[in-house]
Amino acid sequence: MLDLKRIRTDFDTVAAKLKNRGVSEDTLTHLKELDEKRRTLLVQSEELKAERNIASAAIAQAKRQKEDATQQIADMQKVSADIKTIDNQLVAIDQQVTDIITVLPNTPHDSVPVGADEEDNVEIRRWGTPRDFDFEVKAHWDLGEDLDILDWERGAKVTGARFLFYKNLGARLERALYNFMLDEHIKEGYQEIITPYMVNHDSMFGTGQYPKFKEDTFELADTNFVLIPTAEVPLTNYYRGEILDGKELPIYFTAMSPSFRSEAGSAGRDTRGLIRLHQFHKVEMVKFAKPEESYQELEKMTANAENILQKLGLPYRVISLCTGDMGFSAAKTYDLEVWIPAQNTYREISSCSNTEDFQARRAQIRYRDEADGKVKLLHTLNGSGLAVGRTVAAILENYQNEDGSVTIPEVLRPYMGGETVISPK
C-alpha cells in the first residue's frame, strides 16, 4: 500500500509513476481532495471538541454556583451534534480513501523500463544455448503420456480441466526437483519453512492479493480461509504486525507448497500441459531486508533462482518487466524464462520482485533500526525458486531423446535413487 503522506507531499512524482502503471491522474486527484477534506474536517472536529470542553467546564461552574446554565447546555448540545456530523463525514471519507488506496499498485523503481505490456519488457541476459535437435521434438504433455508419468485424462475425470496425476518416475522427478531446489536455497542461507496451505483474509490483504484480485483465488465457502496462491502469502505474513530487530536483517525464508489459482481470464491459454494449472508445486523464496539493502538482495535472489536452472543445464533468459507488465505489489521484477523446445520460445519459470515497503505497510511489518532506535517499515522481496511443474516440462522437452526417452539431469540422480533415464514402457 502506498504512503498517503507521500502522495500528499510528492503528488506529481507519484502521479507520473502510477500513470506508467495505468492509473489515471484523476483517481489520485480525487484521493488528494478526499485527504484534504479529511484533514480540514479533523481540524474542525478538534476545534469543536475544544469548544465543547470549555462549554462543559462553564456549565459545571454555573451549576456549582447554582446559576442558570440552560443556554450553555443548549450551545453544548449543538456543538456535540456538529461534532457527530463531522465524525460521520470522516467515517465516510476514510472508507473512500481506503477503497482507493488499497487498489493502487506500487510505484515502479526508477530503473524499471516504461512500457504497456510484455512487448516492452527488456532482456537483460541469457544463459545456455538451446539444443539443436536432429529429430522432431515432442511437447512435454505427449512425452508425459508416452512415458506413463503424467495422466491428464484421469486428472480431468477426478477433478476437472487443468489438473493431472504425476505417476511413477514422473512423481519421483517432481519430488526430486523440489527437494533439490530447497537444498540449494538452504545452502544460500534460507530457512526452510513448511507453511499452512490456507490463510485468512488479512494475510491476503497483507501481500496485496486482496481486495483487488479475489477472483483469482479459491476461497473456502462460509469461512475466513483461502487456499494459498503462492507460499509468498504465508511466508511474508509470518511477521505481520511485528517489529523485528534490525540486527537480524536480512532474513531469508524458503518453502515448497502447492499453489492454487483459479486462472480467471486465462480461458483458451495453455490449455494443455504443465504451464498453467489450477494446482501446482512451487518453491518460494521470501526476504525481509532493510530499505538500503533491498535491491542488492533482489539481485542475490535472482541469482539464487538462476543457480537452479544452471545446475539443471536449462537454457534461460532474464527479463526486466516493464511498468505495464509488473505485478500489483512489485516495485521491480525480474522474470526468468526457460527455453521450451516444442514451443520454440522462452516461458516464465520464475519471477523475483522487490515490493519495497508496499507489502510491509499493508501487513505492518517493521524493524527497529539499531543505529537510531527508530521503528521503520522494512522491505519485502519474493521470488519463485522455481515453479516445479514448469521445470518438469522444461526437463522433459530439453532432455528428450530420439527413442522417446528422457535423460535425467545429473544433479537430480541422487534424488531419484540413481536413475539416469526415463524410458517408454
From Swiss-Prot:
Protein localization: Cytoplasm
Residues reported in the UniProt entry to bind ATP: 261-263, 348-351
Residues annotated for L-serine binding in this entry: 230-232, 284, 384
Pathway noted in the entry: Aminoacyl-tRNA biosynthesis; selenocysteinyl-tRNA(Sec) biosynthesis; L-seryl-tRNA(Sec) from L-serine and tRNA(Sec): step 1/1
Coiled coil: none
EC identifiers of the protein: 6.1.1.11
UniProt KW Ligase keyword: yes
Catalysed reactions, as listed in the record: tRNA(Ser) + L-serine + ATP = L-seryl-tRNA(Ser) + AMP + diphosphate + H(+); tRNA(Sec) + L-serine + ATP = L-seryl-tRNA(Sec) + AMP + diphosphate + H(+)
EC class of the enzyme, as a word: ligase
GO BP annotations listed: selenocysteine biosynthetic process; seryl-tRNA aminoacylation
Keywords: Aminoacyl-tRNA synthetase, ATP-binding, Cytoplasm, Ligase, Nucleotide-binding, Protein biosynthesis
Domain of life from the UniProt record: Bacteria
GO cellular component terms, A-Z: cytoplasm
A Gene Ontology molecular function term of the record: serine-tRNA ligase activity
Family: Belongs to the class-II aminoacyl-tRNA synthetase family. Type-1 seryl-tRNA synthetase subfamily.
Xref: HAMAP family: Ser_tRNA_synth_type1 (MF_00176)
Domain writeup: Consists of two distinct domains, a catalytic core and a N-terminal extension that is involved in tRNA binding.
Function: Catalyzes the attachment of serine to tRNA(Ser). Is also able to aminoacylate tRNA(Sec) with serine, to form the misacylated tRNA L-seryl-tRNA(Sec), which will be further converted into selenocysteinyl-tRNA(Sec).
Quaternary data: Homodimer. The tRNA molecule binds across the dimer.
Name recorded for this polypeptide: Serine--tRNA ligase
Source organism (scientific name): Streptococcus pyogenes serotype M4 (strain MGAS10750)
High-level lineage: Bacteria, Bacillati, Bacillota, Bacilli, Lactobacillales
